[in-house]
Structures are given as C-alpha cells and as structure tokens.
Amino acid sequence: MLFRSEALEFFSIKVQDGPLTSRLQKIREGDIILVGRKATGTLITGNLIPGKRLLLLSTGTGLAPFASLIKDPDVYENYETIVLAHGCRQVSELAYGEHLVDGLRNHEFFGPLIRDKLVYYPTVTREPFRNRGRITDLIASNQMFDDIGQPGLDIETDRIMLCGSPAMLEELPAIFTARGFVEGNHSQPGHFVIEKAFVER
C-alpha cells in the first residue's frame, strides 16, 4: 500500500451502552486492539461493478468508513474521480472531514497523486455555508454536481457508497433505483452499496 499509517483513527459518536462505542471510548494507550486483515461489511469496492466516478455519500459520523477508502491507492487506480460528500447540521461538525482531506492533499507523497482526483463536497443544513442542504436533495436536484462542475448521475460511469443517517439511507437508494441503479452485495456487485449497520434499527 502506498499510503500507510501506523495509527488507527476512530470517528464515532458515543452511544450510551452501545456495544462498540461504550468500549471504544474507554481505550487507553497500551491497550490491545485486534484488527482483522480483511475488510468486511457492505462498503467494499468489490461489491461495485467497475466505473469511472466513485461517489462517497455520508452524513455525520457516516464519514468514518470513507476515511480509509480515500487513503487507499487502489481506489485512485480504479476510478478517475472520487467525490466525497459529507453532510452535517452545523459547520463545526465538518471539521474532521476537512482535516482529513486537507491532510491527504498536502501529504508529501500521496498528495500529488490524488489532488486532481479527490473532490470534497461539505454541506450543512442549519447554518449559512457555501454548500447548503441535505445530500439527498442536492443529488436529486443535481445541485451538488453543478456545484462541483461535473455532470449529473450517470448509470454507465457512477458507482456509489452510502453511509449515514437512516433517512438518507432510505431516500437515496429509492432515487438511485428509480434511475435504474442496482444495489450491490458480496454475491452480486452493483452500482451502489449501503452501510447496513446504520440501516438496521
């Protein structure tokens, strides 16, 4: 791997008595953490059919799985453009995403390779900001694509990963399906994939 870090980053909200976060928030220096070698779950690029533009659509802490994807050189080899959209209520909630993307773009070795391929699109719903609105609405209206100066959704070239609020994970797949996009999984790759952990209630 071209970009490798010895550090693990966790971006999460604290869930009272949550099975994972109640333990994560108590981790201290020197604690042992076991990490598997193989990625699991539904947000795996192998669950997508080949394409040219990868849309990573997130709200809130749904940005977390994309933090590792945008550091993966294979993603940049397989896609011409990677669009990372991050929607939050307030501007202050965008801080981690901005820090993450700025760090990658300014990385001594990785930055020059990804600078022209990675498009970051932050948006908020409750405060004045250069991009305003819910990701769902910005996709449906084509506003996000207009804002970044790129063509709208194209089933031939676009592949999509979703992670975030239950509302987004319910609404966007309906929009994509209505346009002919097919959800992918381990046995049958498709045009888009959803982080199921957020969907199941």
Where do the PLM segments sit?
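Ser/Thr-glycine-rich phosphate-binding loops at phosphate-binding pockets of nucleotides
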Residues: 2, 59-64
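Reductase modules of NAD(P)H-dependent flavoproteins
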Residues: 85, 92-201
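Histidine-anchored nucleotide/phosphate-binding helix
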Residues: 65-77
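Ferredoxin-reductase
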Residues: 1-29
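Short, Lys/Arg- and Gly-enriched loop/turn segments at beta-strand edges
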Residues: 40-49
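Conserved beta-strand elements of the Class I
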Residues: 54-57, 161
